[in-house]
């Protein structure tokens, strides 16, 4: 509308996380979408880059990263001093924000910590709240809730660091895994994303190394049985009413859908997925049911397995801040559903304002 004041968007990216670089890539896509011809009439973006040490940097340096004028790993300490780090608690840099758009993937962001901090500003936040974010980040807690709801999943076991304290205890854990799960299986940190820290285990000799690898990232470890499956994904947006996107399938060239496959491989994306209409309907139903159960709203991506031998639907996990990179499934799903990236980011802001 003529004369309507532009909404000031606080775009937060980077972060003290193993998924730092993915966050930057996502933020670049969203930044460009907000600065498109159609959106720059409605929105003005102020960027906040959080470096790998957790320091907040001001808009000028943040925009240079988003515009590829400088690489995040080339920022010198002197530049940070000259630009002056931002103290969030001072509030000076944050007073003129109307809506927050956090794009921090992984720990110290997607786990609800950034949402809790931003609530102190009393401004709307794109995405879900603290509870849904925290549960969505913790695979073990998430799967426990899904189990209580009787939603089908792959067989799994969960362990704590104290379960792996010494050699004898580790032997008991390995024996339990061998007794209850069939090869292959996947060992995962409970709190991690983008397949970081995950190992595919095909024989007994690999178990201990995979457990120790996961321990380096998190103190809680998930072990899931591997099946012959198709990777199916569904996008969710909304608040009181959750909308589902088209269903998509990812076909990858590697042995499994690891970090490199997600971000550096030429995967085949099929949207809509070539599956039966009844299965599509059931996947969408479970996607909404699972988000409601975890108090997830705003936007999310719900990941499923479809067992090849039986077409059985298995819920995998929910990502509360899915990737927005050029290779990311979430924006592709919504583009196929009638919302291009420019429309999508605007829609997500509108959803946050409706809360």
UniProtKB/Swiss-Prot annotation:
Alphabetically ordered keywords of this record = ATP-binding, Cell shape, Cell wall biogenesis/degradation, Cytoplasm, Ligase, Magnesium, Manganese, Metal-binding, Nucleotide-binding, Peptidoglycan synthesis
Read off the Pfam families from this record: Dala_Dala_lig_C, Dala_Dala_lig_N
Q: Where in the cell is it found?
A: Cytoplasm
What cofactor does this protein call for? Mg(2+); Mn(2+)
Q: Which GO terms describe its cellular component?
A: cytosol
| Note on how the cofactor is bound | Binds 2 magnesium or manganese ions per subunit.
> Could you tell me which residue ranges the ATP-grasp domain spans?
143-350
**A Gene Ontology biological process term:** regulation of cell shape
**Under which EC number(s) is this enzyme classified?**
6.3.2.4
Q: Which residues bind ATP?
A: 178-233
Catalytic reaction annotation: 2 D-alanine + ATP = D-alanyl-D-alanine + ADP + phosphate + H(+)
Q: Does the keyword Ribonucleoprotein apply?
A: no
Q: Its function?
A: Cell wall formation.
State the PANTHER family in the record: D-ALANINE--D-ALANINE LIGASE, D-ALANINE--D-ALANINE LIGASE A
What's the family? Belongs to the D-alanine--D-alanine ligase family.
Q: What is this protein called?
A: D-alanine--D-alanine ligase
The source organism is Prochlorococcus marinus (strain MIT 9215)
């Amino acid at each position: 509308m003529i004369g309507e004041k532009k909404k000031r968007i606080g775009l937060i990216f980077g972060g003290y996380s193993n998924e730092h670089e993915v966050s930057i890539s996502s933020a670049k896509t969203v930044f460009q979408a907000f600065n498109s011809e159609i959106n720059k009439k409605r929105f003005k973006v102020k960027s906040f880059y959080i470096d790998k040490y957790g320091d907040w940097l001001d808009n000028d340096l943040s925009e240079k990263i988003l515009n590829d004028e400088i690489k995040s790993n080339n920022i010198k300490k002197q530049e940070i001093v000259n630009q002056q780090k931002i103290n969030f608690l001072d509030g000076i840099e944050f007073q003129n924000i109307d809506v927050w758009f956090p794009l921090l993937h992984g720990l110290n962001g997607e786990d609800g910590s950034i949402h809790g901090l931003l609530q102190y500003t009393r401004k709307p936040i794109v995405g879900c709240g603290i509870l849904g974010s925290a549960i969505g980040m913790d695979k073990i807690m998430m799967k426990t809730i899904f189990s209580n709801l009787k939603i089908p999943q792959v067989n799994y076991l969960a362990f704590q660091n104290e379960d792996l304290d010494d050699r004898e205890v580790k032997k008991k854990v390995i024996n339990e895994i061998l007794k209850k799960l069939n090869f292959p299986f996947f060992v995962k940190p409970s709190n991690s994303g983008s397949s970081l820290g995950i190992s595919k285990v095909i024989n007994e000799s690999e178990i201990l190394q995979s457990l120790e690898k996961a321990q380096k990232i998190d103190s809680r470890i998930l072990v899931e049985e591997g099946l012959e499956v198709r990777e199916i994904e569904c996008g969710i947006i909304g608040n009181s009413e959750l909308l589902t996107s088209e269903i998509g399938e990812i076909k990858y060239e590697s042995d499994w859908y690891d970090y490199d496959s997600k971000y550096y491989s030429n995967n085949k994306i099929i949207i809509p997925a070539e599956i039966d209409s009844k299965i599509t309907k059931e996947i969408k139903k479970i996607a909404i049911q699972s988000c409601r159960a975890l108090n997830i709203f705003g936007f999310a991506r719900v990941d499923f397995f479809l067992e090849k031998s039986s077409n059985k639907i298995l819920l995998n996990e929910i990502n509360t801040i899915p990737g927005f990179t050029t290779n990311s499934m979430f924006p592709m799903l919504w583009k196929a559903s009638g919302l291009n990236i420019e429309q999508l980011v605007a829609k997500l802001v509108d959803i946050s304002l409706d809360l």
